[in-house]
């Protein structure tokens, strides 16, 4: 396919137009008085949202050169969302400012590589100062504050804080749709994995269709159980103890499953069997997690163990186990606390070392199951549109709260970025780099300026007054008052602010040093080839409908 090429000023100007179109759309949502944006959906009702990354991902411009600029800023938002889970609009505003101011200087003859060097130096200094003024997020009240600022709702902040209080900072917190109009928090204590009972005849509660086991023994193996004789000696010992038994195995088939069910129905013993969670190597790791949690030994060939070798010492214990058709929940496993802590640390090390997003996600799930319970926030609303919008806000609040716990918090509303300006201005940079430093100094003001203007105030006036205030004093755009931001509960996670600045600076510096841009040339009709294919007559497709 033929290509169009643009060079130097023409190339950068086209990309700036795209950057501005996306950023101007996103930045209207910033702050407590930010507006919403309505997104058309191909099916269902439109989505009304003020979530920056959701808006950015929807934008695709007709002009290919402008679209490249827009997609670069969209990447800033996405990267910030991936790292910190929030701060996407702030990152977009910072990127627009750096690109816009940078292009003015490049057009005036400044050295793009010198500007890039200055941007990197100023960003590094700003990040250092943000970390210096950061305070830890340790109390439940602080988590409420972080969640409230992110979502714009104190109630949402309370849900997040309650959930983290129940399951721990590393615990699993999921966000689901509620069938009612009220939002509620449901906490599942202990470890849960997505495998249910192998036979409905194993249930003990016919109304809930659940099997409840009190103080059960737990047999864990990665083997398939086909012959009941393999575990018969062990079953006889469990019967003598008059305790229920949970069997977690690769599978149970042949004569083994009917025999277990028959003895359960006759009342010989109370047993529930379930398949092992996960697949392949991940299954082995998850079985070992369960074993550590319950104090069991995994019956596996890796350890040279056979099912017939299993003894009562091989079994784990728990205070309670609940099994339904889809899930198994183990509450208060009897594993050694030191062994559990060592296992948690091992998984944390694996999370830090892995380069695969998928592996990292699965490792974090395992970590959460070991480190805490499972909390479910069920989001209710009067309409589907409202429910979608609320879910996005709760997701942002949850991510912000976790980021706050991880790296602490700073004054919110863009105040912290203005607070570090004086330290960044002290940088000793050469003539080319000082231009880049000044570009970052200007960008650090932009979030406060945009928040103020969205609330109907003059941004430049607010910034000048803010620069003369003591550390921690800032402008509450919701009320129009000057307050101690932390005392007023207006805080941002340090990780969110840091990630927004670093990602914005990184992409913007690269864009400023761009000298040529290459894009596919549209076809003769003025449409993209891809767009033209969408209107193809169904009769031209190779075959009719079946």
Curated annotation (Swiss-Prot):
It comes from the Bacteria. CDD domains: GroEL. Coiled coil: none annotated. Its EC number is 5.6.1.7. It is an enzyme of class 5 (isomerase). Together with its co-chaperonin GroES, plays an essential role in assisting protein folding. The GroEL-GroES system forms a nano-cage that allows encapsulation of the non-native substrate proteins and provides a physical environment optimized to promote and accelerate protein folding. This is Chaperonin GroEL. It comes from Tetragenococcus halophilus. The gene is groEL.
């Amino acid at each position: 396919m033929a290509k169009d090429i643009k060079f130097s000023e023409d190339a950068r100007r086209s990309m700036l137009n795209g950057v501005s179109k996306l950023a101007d759309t996103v930045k209207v949502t910033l702050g407590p008085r930010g507006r919403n944006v309505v997104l058309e959906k191909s099916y269902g009702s439109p989505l009304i949202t003020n979530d920056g990354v959701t808006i950015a991902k929807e934008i695709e411009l007709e002009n290919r050169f402008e679209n490249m600029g827009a997609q670069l800023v969209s990447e800033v938002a996405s990267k910030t969302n991936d790292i910190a889970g929030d701060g996407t609009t702030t990152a977009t505003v910072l990127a627009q400012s750096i690109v816009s101011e940078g292009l003015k200087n490049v057009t005036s003859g400044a050295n793009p590589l010198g500007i890039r060097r200055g941007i990197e130096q100023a960003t590094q200094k700003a990040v250092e100062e943000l970390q210096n003024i950061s305070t830890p997020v340790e109390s439940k009240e602080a988590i409420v504050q972080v969640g409230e600022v992110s979502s714009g709702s104190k109630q949402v902040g309370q849900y997040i804080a309650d959930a983290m209080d129940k399951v721990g900072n590393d615990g699993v917190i999921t966000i689901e749709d509620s069938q009612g109009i009220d939002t509620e928090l449901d906490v599942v204590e202990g470890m849960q994995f997505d495998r249910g009972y192998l036979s409905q005849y194993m249930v003990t509660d016919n109304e809930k269709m659940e099997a409840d086991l009190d103080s059960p023994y737990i047999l864990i193996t990665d083997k398939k159980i086909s012959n009941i004789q393999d575990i018969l000696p062990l079953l006889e010992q469990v019967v003598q103890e008059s305790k229920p038994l949970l069997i977690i195995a690769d599978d149970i088939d042949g004569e083994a499953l009917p025999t277990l069910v028959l003895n359960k129905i006759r009342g010989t013993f109370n047993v529930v069997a379930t398949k092992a969670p996960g697949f392949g190597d991940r299954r082995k790791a998850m079985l070992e997690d369960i074993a550590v949690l319950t104090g069991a030994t995994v019956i596996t060939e890796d350890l040279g163990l056979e099912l017939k070798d299993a003894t009562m010492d091989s079994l784990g214990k728990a205070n309670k186990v609940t099994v339904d058709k889809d899930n198994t929940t183990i509450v208060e496993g009897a594993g050694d606390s030191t062994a559990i802590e060592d296992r948690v640390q091992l998984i944390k090390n694996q999370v830090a070392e892995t380069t695969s997003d998928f592996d990292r996600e699965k490792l974090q799930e395992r970590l959460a199951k070991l480190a805490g319970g499972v909390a479910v926030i069920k989001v209710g609303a009067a309409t589907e549109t409202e429910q979608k919008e609320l879910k996005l806000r709760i997701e942002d609040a949850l991510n912000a709260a976790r980021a706050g716990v991880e790296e602490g918090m700073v004054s919110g509303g863009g105040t912290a970025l203005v607070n570090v300006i004086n330290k960044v201005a002290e940088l000793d940079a050469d003539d080319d780099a000082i231009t880049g430093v000044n570009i970052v100094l200007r960008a650090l003001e932009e979030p406060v300026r945009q928040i103020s203007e969205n609330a109907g105030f003059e941004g430049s006036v607010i910034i000048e007054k803010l620069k003369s205030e003591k550390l921690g004093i800032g402008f509450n755009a919701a009320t129009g008052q000057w307050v101690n931001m932390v005392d007023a509960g207006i805080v941002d996670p340090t990780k969110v602010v840091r990630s927004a600045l670093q990602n914005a600076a990184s992409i913007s510096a690269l864009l400023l040093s761009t000298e040529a841009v290459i894009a596919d040339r549209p076809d003769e009709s003025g449409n993209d080839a891809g767009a033209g294919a969408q209107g193809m007559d169904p009769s031209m497709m190779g075959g009719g409908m079946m």
